[in-house]
Amino acid sequence: MADSEQYTIDVGAIFRAKLGEKTPKWLIRLGRKLLHEDFLNTFFREGYTGVDFAEKALEYMHVTLQVEGLEKIPKDRLVTVASNHPLGGHDALALVAIFGRIYDGNIRIMVNDFLMALKQLNGIFVPVNKMGGQSRNLSAQTDGIFHSDAQVLMFPAGKCARRVKGKIEEMPWRKTFLTKSIETHRDIIPMHFYGQNSWRFYFVDWIGKITGVNKKFPLAMALLVDEMYRAQGKTYRVVIGDPIPWKTFDDSRKPAEWAQWVKKRVENL
């Protein structure tokens, strides 16, 4: 295990670095409550990293995964795992825990700023932040991952599911996972993670949307740690489907159409 103190978080320091030294104390207190600073640091001090971190984090929160289809995962070739993204936290840890153990930690998963804050998963998590300059490097980062010898794990929707017209829906899938898989001859493994966040998460997201706040910062993202905290003790069903050969994706459909085809296949698992 690594030096554990380097992984602890100081919400006050984070807020002051982002918002200035005069950050209101009430805001810091609210941040500590929403981010469950003490709860997280108790676990972070254990010093776990990599796949061990993902497994132990789920164990710490008493989260159980009921995984179906493990026997379908090929171990003799490069693949891309394409999963739905209902939660924003536990589903990412589940990907690392499931496939990280099978592939001896040689995995890469593209995630947002929220998950990149987990330094314990440096080397496995790769940033795809759309806010700020990192987006300019996205193409190069994606190429580097797919042309490596690591197994690629992706949430093609890019962000976790939202409430749309009263229904919880996965966002349309971007085609990048598909075009890069074809380019690098990776079969695609479809995966369906069953679960959803609380009504409060979707309500806050709706408020952020109608007020325009989400254009600067996705408001509901601030609740993701609290959503994970509230989900302690839950059991999630995870279904892994048959690998889809990369040669399946011919010219009979456009790449964007094939991407939605895979999305539908995941939804039907």
Predicted regions and their residues:
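Non-catalytic C-terminal accessory region of glycerolipid acyltransferases
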Residues: 2-7, 11, 138-269
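"Short basic amphipathic alpha-helical interaction patches in structured regions
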Residues: 93-99, 167-168
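Short, glycine/acidic-rich beta->alpha junctions
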Residues: 87-91, 133-134, 169-173
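Structural motif
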Residues: 80-82, 125, 153-155
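Short, surface-exposed basic-aromatic patches at helix termini and helix-loop junctions that form
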Residues: 96-102, 181-183
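Membrane-anchoring hydrophobic helices of lipid-metabolizing enzymes
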Residues: 1-79, 85, 90-94, 104, ...
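Conserved nucleotide-cofactor-binding alpha/beta core module
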Residues: 101-135, 139-147
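Short, flexible loop segments at the rims of nucleotide/cofactor-binding pockets, characterized by
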Residues: 56-62, 128-134, 166-167
